Amino acid sequence: MTSFIPLSEVRREQFDWGVIGWRLIPSKGAKHLVVMDVELTPGGGHAFHRHPGQEEMIVVKEGTIVQYVGEESATLTAGDSAFIPEGEVHASFNDDTEQTAYLQVVMSPSVGADTGYGLEDVSDQEPWRSLRS
């Protein structure tokens, strides 16, 4: 297992809503934690989803997001955080039209062999489909 992870070794993956930097994942030797650097592009958002069997902590490092946990929402700015209980539906949106929002995300336990990240998209189901329309 690697104890030190230089930024140059963090695998980055592009999505239509932003970027995930896979900082600590099973393929790097992690057995219980998943740590991600997340960039939400202006106007981007990670639509409603859940992580079966995983808890999550989101920390806003820079920028502002609208964070949903269940049907509740809050505006979070740098230094704020949100805890998402195991399997809870949630979503993160960057409503700013100019500034990227930077987040640190920690999940536990790790699931699967590659990223350790399990996801079930529920954005096409009610009430989630109508919540931000």
Segments from the language model and where they lie:
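Short beta-strand His + acidic residue motifs that chelate non-heme Fe in jelly-roll/DSBH
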Residues: 48-49, 67-68, 84, 90-97
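Short histidine-centered beta-strand/loop micro-motifs
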Residues: 25-27, 47-52, 93-95, 121
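Conserved short histidine dyad/triad with adjacent acidic residue
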Residues: 21, 36-51
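A cytosolic small-molecule/anion-sensing beta-strand core signal
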Residues: 36, 61-62, 77-78
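Double-stranded beta-helix
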Residues: 3-4, 11-18, 30, 34, ...
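Short acidic-glycine-tyrosine-enriched beta hairpin
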Residues: 71-86
